[in-house]
Amino acid sequence: MTGIVKTDQIQGAGSSTVTIPSGTALNVTTVSGTPTFSGASTFSSDVTLPSINGGQIGGRRNVFINGAMQVFQRSTSESSLGGSTGYFTADRIRFKPNSTAGRFTSTKDSSAPNGFANSLKLDCTTADTSIGAGEYFFLSQKIEGQDLQHFAKGTSDAKPFTVSFYVKGNASATYTCELYDEDNTRQISKTFSVTTNWTRVELLFPADTTGAFDNDNNSSMTFAIWLHAGTNYTSGTLNSSSWASATAANRVSSSNTSFFDSTDRTFFLTGLQLETSSIVTPFEHRTFGEELTLCRRYYQRYGYPFTAFRNSTTYSWVDATIWFLCLPFDADDVVGSHALPVEMRAIPTATMTDAYIRLQNNGQNYNSGNTLQVNGSSTSHASLHIDTSAGLNATNVISFTFNNSNGYYDLSAEL
């Protein structure tokens, strides 16, 4: 018997399996449940799969930089932190303490979940159990507005923010993760748990149709993990369901653990990811070279701890690397310049270990009295004016080196 059978529903018997002969054309509006298609299946119209279409398909999903904690240009270990704000170890990770007596060590650690090589470890070294109302400590990453435009925040097409990361600690803890819109003073927070094992935290923050991000190279949004907070930030109701105008008391959970409650306390972090999506996707790994290039937009260091001076005979440190050449314009002033490998976010500030500067001129080494006087750098070139007490030969090119393995100069355009 041949012909056409029209039906509104096909239902399998028993196992609920329906077999359609090969070559049969079906006009299907909805397939529910968990269907399995075997063989070669051709779909002649659009197919909507929420678990795929709910997020970006393809690479470059992750907005965060150095999420796998690969790059540590400044240092792989710093102690006695907690008294000032800044970037100290992992690139793009900023520590922001306020009025706390707690202190900690930050290190690059080899403990990591499967598929990762590194994590950022914080280790409390001085406890602070008497928490003042205005105290806080959080780690953060700031993001340029021009890198957030695809979230369409402040429009009717606004997209959700999905944050994920891996954490562990010495004991159970509860901390608060916050997204803070700096352009419009809006925020939203959610809590997460830490155990003694590596776990992946997955947090979905809803879209915000109010307040667009500025399209520029300034900081528009801060991602923060609050590890310590006083009642000025914990006494309200945690703003966790939708974006709202920032109220200090609603930013941190009242159940937030204090990282400074004991010198036994540790906190490990890696696998940071931020994507425009309604689902969580696997971490997007990038090569070390890619990650280093992204980090160098904000910070570049030359010298320690990456100084690789080698003596061909003893393999001990020698002052053999010429970092740049200088042109003198009088007997005690020189200017050196070199192109940067990556254009920086803004005109950078410059710092230098003045005590370790060595100027070499006409066969003479000048090891003291040298200071960085003027930074004339641009986003694409370093231009450094060195003042010296030495009497230089103003007709010769002068080389800039260091007289110690701890010598360095750096350029910072951090947010």
Regions found by a protein language model. Give the residues of each.
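Extracellular carbohydrate recognition and processing domains
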Residues: 184-213
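Beta-strand-rich interaction surfaces with strong enrichment in secreted/lumenal proteins
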Residues: 54, 128-129, 149-153, 187-194, ...
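Intrinsic low-complexity, repeat-rich intrinsically disordered segments enriched
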Residues: 1-62, 275-283
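Aromatic (Trp/Tyr/Phe) and Gly/Pro-enriched flexible surface segments
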Residues: 59-137
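Surface-exposed ligand/attachment interfaces on beta-rich extracellular proteins
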Residues: 13-17, 56, 77-84, 196, ...
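Extracellular polysaccharide-targeting segments
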Residues: 50-74, 211-215, 226-307, 411-414
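Phosphate/adenylate-binding glycine loop and adjacent helical scaffold
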Residues: 174, 186, 303-415
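Extra-cytoplasmic beta-strand recognition segments
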Residues: 69, 137-177, 203-211, 271-273, ...
